[in-house]
Amino acid sequence: MDLFDFFRDWDLEQQCHYEQDRSALKKREWERRNQEVQQEDDLFSSGFDLFGEPYKTNKGDALANRVQNTLGNYDEMKDLLTNHSNQNHLVGIPKNSVPQNPNNKNEPSFFPEQKNRIIPPHQDNTHPSAPMPPPSVVILNSTLIHSNRKSKPEWSRDSHNPSTVLASQASGQPNKMQTLTQDQSQAKLEDFFVYPAEQPQIGEAEESNPSAKEDSNPNSSGEDAFKEIFQSNSPEESEFAVQAPGSPLVASSLLAPSSGLSVQNFPPGLYCKTSMGQQKPTAYVRPMDGQDQAPDISPTLKPSIEFENSFGNLSFGTLLDGKPSAASSKTKLPKFTILQTSEVSLPSDPSCVEEILRESQHLTPGFTLQKWNDPTTRASTKMLEDDLKLSSDEDDLEPVKTLTTQCTATELYQAVEKAKPRNNPVNPPLATPQPPPAVQASGGSGSSSESESSSESDSDTESSTTDSESNEAPRVATPEPEPPSTNKWQLDKWLNKVTSQNKSFICGQNETPMETISLPPPIIQPMEVQMKVKTNASQVPAEPKERPLLSLIREKARPRPTQKIPETKALKHKLSTTSETVSQRTIGKKQPKKVEKNTSIDEFTWPKPNITSSTPKEKESVELHDPPRGRNKATAHKPAPRKEPRPNIPLAPEKKKYRGPGKIVPKSREFIETDSSTSDSNTDQEETLQIKVLPPCIISGGNTAKSKEICGASLTLSTLMSSSGSNNNLSISNEEPTFSPIPVMQTEMLSPLRDHENLKNLWVKIDLDLLSRVPGHNSLHAAPAKPDHKETATKPKRQTALTAVEKPAPKGKRKHKPTEVAEKIPEKKQRLEEATTICLLPPCISPAPPHKPPNTRENNSSRRANRRKEEKLFPPPLSPLPEDPPRRRNVSGNNGPFGQDKNIAMTGQITSTKPKRTEGKFCATFKGISVNEGDTPKKASSATITVTNTAIATATVTATAIVTTTVTATATATATTTTTTTTISTITSTITTGLMDSSHLEMTSWAALPLLSSSSTNVRRPKLTFDDSVHNADYYMQEAKKLKHKADALFEKFGKAVNYADAALSFTECGNAMERDPLEAKSPYTMYSETVELLRYAMRLKNFASPLASDGDKKLAVLCYRCLSLLYLRMFKLKKDHAMKYSRSLMEYFKQNASKVAQIPSPWVGNGKNTPSPVSLNNVSPINAMGNCNNGPVTIPQRIHHMAASHVNITSNVLRGYEHWDMADKLTRENKEFFGDLDTLMGPLTQHSSMTNLVRYVRQGLCWLRIDAHLL
């Protein structure tokens, strides 16, 4: 029938108040629809998109005219439309509806039939349910309607196509259509109840989903009841809800939700689309899920769904209380005229509508509505649920129940409990009917049935085959419309769910129990469920994230999921394709954590809830589980076994989702526990383990609060991880079904960790005590201590590794006490220092073998503590100390100097020699002073050198009696004993020799240096140990670039200049390497030339000539001048051969031209020489010469000109070199002491010094400058 003809012919005011008319119309329309759909399937199967545009886009004025005519019939609705400005929305009628309405002959009868049919269901449902919802619910619904109008239209658009697909499918298969009708009507009821405004939009969706609308007839009876409630509360609201869509279609869709005929009002084209939808399983799934299930699930739709969930649950919950009466009052539908008006446009095939309505009647309308609510609510609430999940855990769900259902929350819960027994008896009969009826029996799975009807016989076959399974699967699918793969198992789950729900609803509380199941969580559950549908997998991953190993181990240890596997295997086959959907749906059912349970258990969720219901936490799941019980009865023995394992397997659900329904079921339980345990693990890993070991009921109940709190976060995290994490987790969960072993393993793991930690703690305590007790232990003890610490350090590391491995259970971390952790940290640092010290020890100094680990720790810790204290007392910048390093080299062999030196321990020197900078040039900076700076303690540990202003007890390295003379902050010259000092000095001398031989940086023992040198300044100045190894030019180039970049990053001019000078030294070394390697592409002359420019730039940063210039600036200028001088001289030497050539060539040229020059009076002739004399140059000008010359001006060849210029440039280098040298000499007079020490240490620098000597000399001076300026 033509949809518009239907609207036109449909007299909204004419009300078919009698069930007889409805039944007759149903039958007729169903038959017609089946015929038309079958005929049109081929025609439209491939020619039309699932979701067509509004007719208006195609029809234009014609459509507008039809719509106007239709609207003209709605006298009562006009005011509402005008007032609420819904006309625009009503105008939007799906495109496909018009072209797809080729069967006009059905219009007259179809419209009245549908009208009668639609209206009575509304009235029937309205009468019982109208009184049911409190006026407040109605108000909320009306308000929601307003809010949903906006979101619903888009959703309805999406729904139109799905509904069309469903309609065609429904016509193709009456049973399916019935199921679909129930689902859609249920969804519509949800939408309607959720939001009257949404209902118009839903109406559009229903229009798109003719089957859904047909389904909505029984469901619409409940929905109509709700609408009637709205009407009773405020007729305008109900009308508004109907008209809210703003288009006749929408209005009709509103009615369609109530009577489902509006769904049939869709033209055969829509049905053909339905057939196309069949081709596209995704479309099926979406219609099944709800109006918003259109492949395009717009966020608007989801929000509207969320509103529906919250409000729809309220109204629906309210309806639940009166749903049984609503079912009985289907005959009373005539009362709800406005709803009929809104529905007028939807159904296009009266016979199909009739059949669908009948089937939907068979199915408990309330149940269908509930299912619809669940899918739509879930779909919309998935996103919200992630957010809500934090607060929408079972605790939140209960408040939400109260909020959404207000009075009905408790009623719903009670109804659920009541419905459980009823559902159990009812479900078997419903499941018992034909396989399609089994789908109907799924009732709540109407959405899945719709999608299934979209999939036509395929869905039906499987749904009938796996009624119980499909019941569970469809429910899972309901939360989210899934792609075709999910259609079958979603439908199956829906069927199973619907079956249980239908049974419960049939019992009289069937609607209420199912609604209660979804409603107890009402808003939150759908939202949470949908959020979990999205986050369920994610939640599962969330737990893995928090405790991936724990969950894996637990799930692996759990065999229970396998027990559920037999039952779930069949579902798995279907669910395998729709595993994602299942998980989502399950999530939708379950609340934050329970949703996950349900996700894995969805198929088995119903039986499981019975067990879970025992736990307070499982209250929602209990409500959900009650219908599952019905399923259990339907599925017979399978549910019961699942129930038992599920409590044990809360963790499994995450992983089960992906593995399959069977496994998912136990996992859902496990997952619930996992969530709680996860939250607990967040709180306390051990607790989570214990909780997991505890029966699931205990875990879910006891841990619910924690898990709820954590679940929110987990959900968010898990949402990210949902797909991948849930898949992996599911697999693990299956393996982990027996979580009891997991806790044991975790506990064991934790216990070792704890033991290790305790041991570490004990050691730390011992170290602290020893540090305080024995700050000056003998070096001998210290020496053994180092190796011991090494071993101990390695042991703690191993333990740490174990802890890290075991950390999947965060118990270890949580068990760490702050104090213990604090103790461990220093201990670790000490160990690291010890290890570094040992590594740094010269080959000659072998660390003493570990003798007493505790003692060693004590000695090392005390030694280190002393060092740290000393270092703290004496800041690393030791500018006063570094003066005597040069002498230290000479006196390194003298024991007395070292022993007497109060400022330094030889060990410090020895270890300091170790720390060699990669630069190799400036690496020489001693750790204590230049290298370590603020890091002296750390580097001291590595270099075992800690230089302090008053002499630091670095005493770290000793061959046998390791140094650590415990020259504490005071670092007395005797260093505890003369023997110790002697040993230290001997060792240091040996070590230094070895280090020097190995070209390691040598730290001149500052203590020894002062004795050797009369000046204390020399003693204090450290000497850099330079690496004699030869590197290629690239190595030096890299070093130079590093220093240059470092200088570029500095803002302080002096530090910048020093670093530029240091970089220039590296460039100089690079040039020197180029000289050695003739294959170098770049000329060393060029490198030197560029280095000169860099030095000159560095000198410009500080005006040493200024009266305000500091001694440091002048010292730096001296070093730069020395360097420049030698560089210039070196450049001259490199070009000396060229200069000689140029000189000879020029001399020859002048000789050849001597005769000519003699003939011409010129200054050259005046001197009688080839070279001009100053007198001749002064007396004779070129002009005079030219004037005297008859031949005219003398031309010089270009070659000679270039040669002369090159000759001048080369020879000028010598001049510059000497000039800079003289400048350096002048400035040196102002700092004789500094440069005297430098000359003494490094040897005097001359103009004939090699580039290597120059680099080392200047670098040593720069090091001292850094120390003086505290730049190290």
Curated annotation (Swiss-Prot):
GO terms for cellular component: nuclear speck. The keyword Phosphoprotein applies. Residues 426-438, 844-853, 874-883 have a biased composition (Pro residues). One of its GO terms (biological process) is regulation of RNA splicing. Residues 439-452 have a biased composition (Low complexity). Its main location: nucleus. Residues 630-640 have a biased composition (Basic residues). The keyword Lipid metabolism does not apply. Residues 93-183, 201-225, 283-302, 418-491, 535-687, 779-829, 842-903 are annotated as: Disordered. Residues 97-107, 161-183, 576-586 have a biased composition (Polar residues). RNA-binding protein. Might be involved in alternative splicing regulation through an interaction with G-quartet RNA structure. PANTHER family: AF4/FMR2 FAMILY MEMBER, AF4_FMR2 FAMILY MEMBER 2. This is AF4/FMR2 family member 2.
